Design a protein with these regions (language model features):
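Basic/aromatic-rich interaction segments and small domains that mediate binding to polyanionic partners
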Residues: 27-52, 58
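Mixed-charge, Lys/Arg-rich low-complexity intrinsically disordered regions
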Residues: 1-17
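Intrinsically disordered, low-complexity, charged/polar segments
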Residues: 2-6, 49-68
């Protein structure tokens, strides 16, 4: 998990922007591309495609999705 975040929230996959930090199956990923087929996400160990309709994003200190 990344250093400091202020909680999580579930959002529709279509609203996730590239660079947004998210959690999927207990791991932390960075969103890459959001296409009709799914949300491409990666971390330093693996890449994955998330096809679920909603994803869990990490929040910053202002309660907004954390983007790196």
């Amino acid at each position: 998990m990344i250093g400091m975040h202020y909680g999580t929230t579930s959002v529709p996959r279509s609203e996730v922007l590239p660079g947004t930090m998210l959690q999927h199956h207990g791991k932390t990923y960075r969103a890459s591309a959001n296409v009709e087929k799914g949300l491409y996400a990666f971390n330093i160990f693996e890449k994955t495609i998330i096809k679920s309709d909603s994803v869990v994003v990490l929040l910053n200190e202002r309660g907004e999705p954390m983007v790196h």
